[in-house]
Structures are given as structure tokens and as C-alpha cells.
Regions:
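A structural boundary/capping signal
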Residues: 1-150
């Protein structure tokens, strides 16, 4: 599987059990190689992680929106045994969602690390502006619903 082999390359030079290093390496790799591109108006497109990785190998980069990036980030984290979640967020009225990002758990500290290349270096600022959110586990079937909602 292409996603697995690329993930192994990304984390391959790290010390064993450098879990935070793995998370940060995956975040940096995706940030450097996936460029944000909005979906067309009134259309929701989703590129699977395999396709994004193929584009990266073919062109050196891929294009995708926040959900494409979050799915790739979570898939790569799952490939190295990390727990991952999707945070579906809104910045306006309750229940009005406009963004999604991944967060990955560092098993050593149990802390969740926000991985959002779309926010770039402004992650803290973005998190402060969130007015509504749902957290979905990537480890469970979607039929269970969100694990947390505000």
C-alpha cells in the first residue's frame, strides 16, 4: 500500500518510540506536499489518501481541501499505530461547520496534537475562533456518532 510505504519513509529515520516525533514528521510532510484548494462551489469532493500520495509522487505535490488533508493525515497516523480523530469545526452559528482537521494522540503523554496544515502557524488563533465542533474517532465505526460535541 502506497500510503503505508510513504509513511514508513517519513518516520523511518526517527528513534524508536519517538511518538511525538512521528506525529510532527507526518504533519510536516503533509504540510510541505499538499496545497490547499477549495472544492467547487456547492460540490463536495473527497480525494482518498492513495490518490493524494500518487499525485505527490507524480508531481511533487498534491492539491486538496481541508477534508482531503485531514483524511491523509489521519490515515498516515493510523499506519504507525497512533489514534486519530477528525475535528469538524465551525466559526459562526452553532451547528454551522466549515472546516475539518485531524488530531493525533501522543501515546506517551496521552495528549492530542492538532495537525492542521491549513491553519499553518496560526493553529492557536484558529482554535480560539472555533464556536462549534464535533470530534469523530477514526478508530470506531461512524455509526457511533461523534465522541464530543459543542
Amino acid at each position: 500500500m502506497l500510503v503505508r510505504s510513504l509513511t514508513e519513509q517519513v518516520v523511518g529515520d526517527l528513534w524508536p518510540k519517538d511518538y511525538l516525533g512521528e506525529i510532527l514528521a507526518i504533519n510536516a510532510w503533509v504540510s510541505e506536499r499538499v496545497r490547499y484548494l477549495n472544492d467547487p462551489m456547492h460540490v463536495e469532493l473527497l480525494k482518498d489518501p492513495q490518490r493524494l500520495c500518487e499525485e505527490i509522487l507524480d508531481k511533487g505535490f498534491a492539491r486538496g481541501d481541508c477534508d482531503d488533508i485531514a483524511v491523509l493525515m489521519a490515515t498516515m497516523a493510523l499506519q504507525v499505530g497512533r489514534h486519530a480523530q477528525f475535528v469538524v469545526a465551525g466559526f459562526g452559528a452553532p451547528g454551522s461547520f466549515s472546516h475539518v482537521f485531524a488530531r493525533i494522540q501522543d501515546p506517551r503523554s496521552s495528549q492530542w496534537i492538532v495537525c492542521d496544515p491549513v491553519a499553518g502557524s496560526n493553529v492557536a488563533s484558529m482554535l480560539k475562533r472555533i464556536t462549534t465542533y464535533q470530534i469523530w474517532s477514526c478508530d470506531e465505526l461512524p455509526s457511533h456518532g461523534p465522541v464530543e460535541t459543542r
